[in-house]
Amino acid sequence: MKDIIIASFYKFIPLNDFESLREPILTKMHEIGIKGTIILAHEGVNGGFAGNREQMNVFYDYLRSDSRFADLHFKETYDNKNPFDKAKVKLRKEIVTMGVQKVDPSYNTGTYLSPEEWHQFIQDPNVILLDTRNDYEYELGTFKNAINPDIENFREFPDYVQRNLIDKKDKKIAMFCTGGIRCEKTTAYMKEQGFQHVYQLHDGILNYLESIPESESLWEGKCFVFDDRVAVDQKLDRVYPQLPQDYKYEREQK
């Protein structure tokens, strides 16, 4: 039985006091025994952390005790050991760095599709299926017929759109990422640019893998995750027990 719960979450919401939230959250993580990384910025909060069920429930309640976080949704996966080695709370300019100002995912994002809706939608040959992740993530696994933007980091995505998609504003574009947060920004950016039909996989690839039977799945390969599991398969089991050196630098920049 897998006793460790791994939770990922995010919320785009203005946090004028985000700097003052760091120490209380970090103190609570140490107090409970939670390990993981939480990122705070003016635009909101993003993170992943892990512990046993009792620890996680206590920390969920703590975070939700702030009225701004009362509706936080935690996406859970499970493992036999904690994939994080310590507790960290970081202050950043963005909770996921795209480097484009005046993009507000708190109100202007793509249309959410459930895993079941997504499964049907991306089989339409008229849909442009776009992987918003980095090139090494794409190489590990992606959806059948997905386009690889061939980017080394998320900051390069806007340039990809300007070079390759700007003349396709009337097309249906389906976008996906690991857990959903990058798609919040990419779809918001594209709507700001005038794209009319933008869709995103709700809660990302991990939600699809959990929801769609492997025998029917349109996912091919493994899914990279930003913790010491490195990647998971279609059953959400870890693929590599140790972290390859190739991915260390990217993880440390998160």
Swiss-Prot record:
The active site is at 177 (cysteine persulfide intermediate). Residues 123-217 form the Rhodanese domain. It catalyses: uridine(34) in tRNA + AH2 + O2 = 5-hydroxyuridine(34) in tRNA + A + H2O. Its EC number is 1.14.-.-. GO terms for biological process: tRNA modification. It comes from the Bacteria. SMART domains: RHOD (SM00450). The keyword Magnesium does not apply. GO terms for molecular function: oxidoreductase activity, acting on paired donors, with incorporation or reduction of molecular oxygen. The keyword Oxidoreductase applies. Keywords: Oxidoreductase, tRNA processing. Transmembrane segments: none annotated. Catalyzes oxygen-dependent 5-hydroxyuridine (ho5U) modification at position 34 in tRNAs. Belongs to the TrhO family. This is tRNA uridine(34) hydroxylase. The lineage of its organism: Bacteria, Pseudomonadati, Pseudomonadota, Gammaproteobacteria, Legionellales. The gene is trhO.
